[in-house]
A protein has these predicted regions:
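Short aromatic-hydrophobic micro-motifs that form the base-stacking/packing surface
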Residues: 27-29
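Short, high-confidence coil segments that cap the C-terminus of an alpha-helix
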Residues: 23, 51-52, 97
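Short, glycine-/small-residue-rich phosphate/pyrophosphate-handling segment
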Residues: 70-92
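Acidic metal-phosphate-binding loop of nucleotide-sugar-dependent transferases
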Residues: 5, 33-35
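Conserved donor-nucleotide/metal-binding helix-loop-beta segment in metal-dependent transferases, i.e.
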Residues: 36-62
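Conserved alpha/beta core of the MobA/IspD/sugar-nucleotide pyrophosphorylase nucleotidyltransferase superfamily
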Residues: 83, 90-141
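Short phosphate-binding loop-to-helix
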Residues: 1-25, 84
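Conserved hydrophobic/aromatic beta-strand scaffold that supports enzyme active sites
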Residues: 56, 67-69
Length: 141
């Protein structure tokens, strides 16, 4: 078992719940992506191809999958973990999905290590996450 097993299990359970309720799309954003904007989300929704399809946004190092829009959700099994971005692209292509990779600066930073919190502090903007980290006063000026 690895640190991403919980996310993979939660994604699988979510797919089952969506199917049971007749929902045809799944928009998954991990909780550690603090800089996304409403405009980026709207752009993803507008650019998502008709089913069967995968729209995917990588982490800035292109190793992680920081956003997935999958239609229908049952068309592929998500496998988060090391190098998940390229693994998801391969799984989608193998399963005959239209693949729509996109990149957005707000989706680039994910909080995996302490150094990522410093990146968050240095980043432009004033998100709730940034305000909270500043409030904790972890870094002395």
């Amino acid at each position: 078992t690895g640190p991403d097993d919980g996310l993979n299990q939660a994604a699988g359970e979510t797919v089952n719940h969506l199917l049971e309720n007749g929902i045809r799309d799944m928009f998954l954003i991990p909780a550690d992506i603090p800089l996304i904007t409403e405009e980026e989300i709207n752009s993803i929704l507008k650019a998502h191809p008709s089913a069967p399809s995968l729209t995917i946004i990588p982490s800035r190092d292109k190793f992680g999958s920081n956003c997935i829009l999958l239609s229908p959700p049952s068309r592929m099994t998500l496998k988060f973990g090391p190098n998940s971005y390229f693994r998801h692209l391969e799984i989608a292509q193998t399963n005959g999905l239209k693949v729509n990779p996109m990149e957005f600066p707000g989706f680039g930073l994910d909080i995996d290590e302490p150094k990522d919190l410093f990146e968050l502090l240095k980043a432009e903007g004033n998100t709730r996450s940034q305000k909270y980290i500043r409030h904790l006063n972890l870094v002395k000026n």
